[in-house]
Amino acid sequence: MFGGILTSRCCSMKESAMRSWFGRSRLFAWHLVALLVFALALAPRLAAQGGEPQYFAIRGATVVPVSGPRLENATVIVARGVIKAVAKDAPIPDEALVIDGKGLTIYPGLIDAFTDVGMMPAPAPSGGEGGAHAQPPLSRGPEDRPGTTPWRSAADEVNLADKRIETWRSAGFTTVVSSPKGGMFPGVAAVLDLDGERNGDLVVKPSTAIPVSLQPAGGFTSFPGSLMGAIAYVRQVWLDVDWSTKAGAIYQKNPRGVARPRYDRANAALAEALEDHALVLIPANNTTQIRRAFDLADRWHVHSVLYGGQMSYEVASEIAARKLPVLIDLKWPEAEKDADPDDAPSLRALRFRDRAPSSPAALAKAGAKFAFYSGAITAPKDMLKAVKKSIDAGLAPDAALRALTLSPAEIFDVADRLGSIEAGKIANLIITDGDLFDEKTKIKLVFVDGRRFEIREPEKPKDPPKGDLTGKWKFSYTTPEGPEESIVDLSMASDGTLSGTLSSPRGNANIISGYLSADKFSFTINIPIEGSPTDVIFTGTFDGTTMKGSISVQGLDIDFTATKPGRSGAADHVATQQGDAR
């Protein structure tokens, strides 16, 4: 596509212009143009095959390794996805692309310690008679088991189409501990890096943790029907796993004369995960839940981690004494927006809202290990704001940074490759123009597995948008090679800000900024051309059914039109009227 753009423009140049531009013979000029067009036409394909530089030197920056003291005026060398050196006088390889780090600060990539980012969306429940929700399928075992699917693996259910991958990455989160959702034993979590061309590229550690929930998949309207029933059910599942494991071991040792134990898929999956040293994540947000989690951890005799942890300020010393790590939910409690103003909250509820952000400081003071996770936060930038609240409540900034980097890596046993800036570790880095927890600081670059992503402030529209560009659009244009098409999947915010992806026969790219202002739009993608990031800018107008405009790259243009496949003009007109009414 992009090579065709240059061909179209270059081929239209007059002979005299070409002679003056190149200062050589017309034949030599055409050879140069042909070579340039060939290189640019291959650029998207090369990017997909690793055309991005493999060696980088970020020179003269402030480096915050987390595992050691801060380094001033230091250089970080990245080679083929791995940190090769971190030092003030690190030698720079000849093949490295040098990035000027003056005035910049390098941090380890951040880790969201418990989420479902990068997972396939859970199927929506279908309605039954009278609007009742259909119940999810049951796991078959000694009895029907609701929401017990431990054979599901996050490593097998990676969804590269999840747009949150880019959103989290742009906010500085290079790694997540992600799990399938739904039910009391939804599946096995995995450690994922947030970049890759294929699903398996994201997986850092496949069998990491077994999340447990005390909320049935169908709510308490279905079995087990109550909190006490859910607790009893979960305990029984672990008893079944223990019995099944022991019975299987006895049979394998001497199968003669012994009845063969029945294979049970759920038990086998849980036993296998435990053999792989997977942690068991137990819900524990308030004091009652935390002490209940103590009891469950004692009964199960497994390596347990508490998650929730927002009332840890009341029992921090007990948690530390038991050496139980805590994953702290950063969605701090707050008043419900639609709460009845006459329904005054209890004093305990008000105290909880006020003191929850102090839980990390209480745990740090007690000597407990903890990490942060997003919980119900949908905008990852809000996670740093939530961490800032915990800093304001007494947590040291260094401890806050550690809870976003090295601590989760240690909890999930990947600190040998993630969580700090050290030679030999995966090159997951974020580069900022200031202190990470300063609200004015901007993230400039992110590296995931050594791949560079430039982070830009989104363009803002000047006028309210006339219509909504959300949806898939077919872009049509003509190059000297013939007609070509690209599919652009757009999402538009209420203020007209655009995001999305472009897919073409020559490669794929993410939209790094864009907007619809009145009836005028613009969006930008960035691709590597000859090893350098290059902007490709789409601009034009929207008449309610069609987009028309031009694609510009390195000062050269080609015209395009875009329509929504399979959508009638009347439907688009109605949507536009609705957008105008907004």
Please place each PLM-identified region on the residue numbering.
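His/Asp/Glu-enriched, well-ordered alpha-helical/loop segment
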Residues: 122-123, 130-143, 151, 279, ...
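Polyanionic/metal-chelating signatures
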Residues: 161-311, 442, 448, 455-456
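Histidine-rich, glycine-flanked metal-binding segment
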Residues: 50, 54, 63, 67-109, ...
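Acidic, glycine-enriched loop/beta-strand segments at the rims
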Residues: 50, 55, 63-75, 88, ...
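Central antiparallel beta-sheet cores of small beta-barrel/beta-sandwich binding domains
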Residues: 467-543, 548-565
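Extracellular/periplasmic ectodomains of large secreted or surface enzymes and adhesion receptors
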Residues: 49-53, 361-365, 431, 437, ...
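Bacterial N-terminal signal peptides
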Residues: 29-45
